[in-house]
């Protein structure tokens, strides 16, 4: 029963199911292991039992493993792994501090160089999203991959059956940030920026627009809450034109459908009348709430901006002139929040909620990588990206962040890698049978992973010629595994070695499965916004 629960919890992640083990664990390379949280007591029934993880690592990698915990929400006694534990915590479904990624990679790098047998075992709670973010960054740091998208796709294929590895847009974005810093030899320095305006375009659906709220945090510290600040909020909405088809045919019978259209026409006229009264400083019974009908809750006239009458609603001011005269750009609809001048630096989280504080969407950006006009599409917004049927947000929905003039020189300092750093990168060969190689972004990518047993005495042997190799061919839209093995049930992604050892002291074999119709190819974070930084 416990095994069934573990399989259910791990979902589409690859598991180690051999030699008496059943662990949510997969080899990404010879020396990088991804796994779920090592748990105790009741949680150990449906997650990785701590004792089983300890036994596994002692059996196959005794004295040569270091565990990295990425969970901010839970810890364990480091003595359970002989004190060899690295702790780089950040919240689930969130991005880490950008500096933390580099610190993590340097830690893993130092550990690997102590002994060629050493491995890094990396986990968060589920062992997929946060774990994947850090592993993908490491794959670029050590030179195995140069391209962000390829690194993400490689990890997804080796960690999951459905090729859905890192799926949170903000986490993908941060892999892209780090990849760029590696490729461009950027020494990261947080840049101070001034946020002036946030625009949602087109308008979100199924929500009272007057109830849209948001907060801005630097790291975990909230620095701006729309409920507590006065600001101008401008809503631009299309003017609807209703044609009464009954007037074209006097003999046409009055149907329920036609009757509703007549009512819509009357409501439209009443709405415009209400707005006209509002602009004259009068209150109207129709001005109940700002919603799809284009009305706003009754409030005081607080003046004009650019000829537009402003209305006070809570702590914010709304301009509705566009609603009254249809004076929009084409079919443009948006809601704009004029923040003023908010100074920010580093890792920024912006979260939009409704009046009940239910999350609409959120996203992370880093100020050192943004442009003066940063556009984040729906696919780059956490939670909103799941709205595949566009019920809550239009397909072309996006967020626009307008910053004050940016100091490009302050953005980052470009440095040339020292001879020592160049030597360090050469420690990890660019082409071998346990790493993926790519000659260009669009070329096919071939990854060779043997099903031979892994042994802690040979887990860095890069000259294997085992006859039972499984070949992973990765194209831009599809990843597939092919091998002489045919049993897909116990497939594991364990890279190759040549030494033949008994199963008692060997890690799982790779048994290949063909994976088709990849629908989880990650978007390169450098293009996660409509404008590259």
Curated annotation (Swiss-Prot):
Record has rRNA-binding as a keyword: no
The protein's Enzyme Commission number: 3.1.3.16, 3.1.3.48, 3.1.3.67, 3.1.3.-
UniProt record, GO biological process: actin filament polymerization; adenylate cyclase-modulating G protein-coupled receptor signaling pathway; aggregation involved in sorocarp development; bleb assembly; cell motility; chemotaxis; chemotaxis to cAMP; establishment of cell polarity
GO terms, molecular function: inositol-1,3,4,5,6-pentakisphosphate 3-phosphatase activity; inositol-1,3,4,5-tetrakisphosphate 3-phosphatase activity; phosphatidylinositol-3,4,5-trisphosphate 3-phosphatase activity; phosphatidylinositol-3,4,5-trisphosphate 5-phosphatase activity; phosphatidylinositol-3,4-bisphosphate 3-phosphatase activity; phosphatidylinositol-3,5-bisphosphate binding; phosphatidylinositol-4,5-bisphosphate binding; protein serine/threonine phosphatase activity
A Gene Ontology term for the protein's cellular component: cell projection
Chief location of this protein within or outside the cell: membrane
Keywords, alphabetical: Cell cycle, Cell membrane, Chemotaxis, Cytoplasm, Hydrolase, Lipid metabolism, Lipid-binding, Membrane, Protein phosphatase
Alphabetized CDD domains for the sequence: PTP_PTEN
Keyword Cell membrane: yes
Positions of the catalytic residues: 124
Domain C2 tensin-type stretches: 271-406
Domain (Phosphatase tensin-type): residue spans on this chain: 14-185
Membrane topology designation: Peripheral membrane protein
Reactions performed catalytically: a 1,2-diacyl-sn-glycero-3-phospho-(1D-myo-inositol-3,4,5-trisphosphate) + H2O = a 1,2-diacyl-sn-glycero-3-phospho-(1D-myo-inositol-4,5-bisphosphate) + phosphate; O-phospho-L-seryl-[protein] + H2O = L-seryl-[protein] + phosphate; O-phospho-L-threonyl-[protein] + H2O = L-threonyl-[protein] + phosphate; O-phospho-L-tyrosyl-[protein] + H2O = L-tyrosyl-[protein] + phosphate
Top enzyme category: hydrolase
Biased amino acid composition, Polar residues: 410-439, 479-505
Region (Disordered): 235-298, 410-533
UniProt feature, compositional bias: Low complexity: 265-298, 455-478, 517-533
Family annotation (InterPro entries): C2_domain_sf, Dual-spec_lipid-protein_phosph, Prot-tyrosine_phosphatase-like, PTP_PTEN, Tensin_C2-dom, Tensin_phosphatase, Tyr_Pase_AS, Tyr_Pase_dom
Subcellular location per the Swiss-Prot or TrEMBL entry: Cell membrane; Cytoplasm; Cytoplasm, Cell cortex
Family label: Belongs to the PTEN phosphatase protein family.
Protein purpose: Dual-specificity protein phosphatase, dephosphorylating tyrosine-, serine- and threonine-phosphorylated proteins. Also functions as a lipid phosphatase, removing the phosphate in the D3 position of the inositol ring of PtdIns(3,4,5)P3/phosphatidylinositol 3,4,5-trisphosphate, PtdIns(3,4)P2/phosphatidylinositol 3,4-diphosphate and PtdIns3P/phosphatidylinositol 3-phosphate with a preference for PtdIns(3,4,5)P3.
PANTHER family in alphabetical order: PHOSPHATASE WITH HOMOLOGY TO TENSIN, PHOSPHATIDYLINOSITOL 3,4,5-TRISPHOSPHATE 3-PHOSPHATASE AND DUAL-SPECIFICITY PROTEIN PHOSPHATASE PTEN
Name used for this protein in its record: Phosphatidylinositol 3,4,5-trisphosphate 3-phosphatase and dual-specificity protein phosphatase PTEN
Provenance organism: Dictyostelium discoideum (Social amoeba)
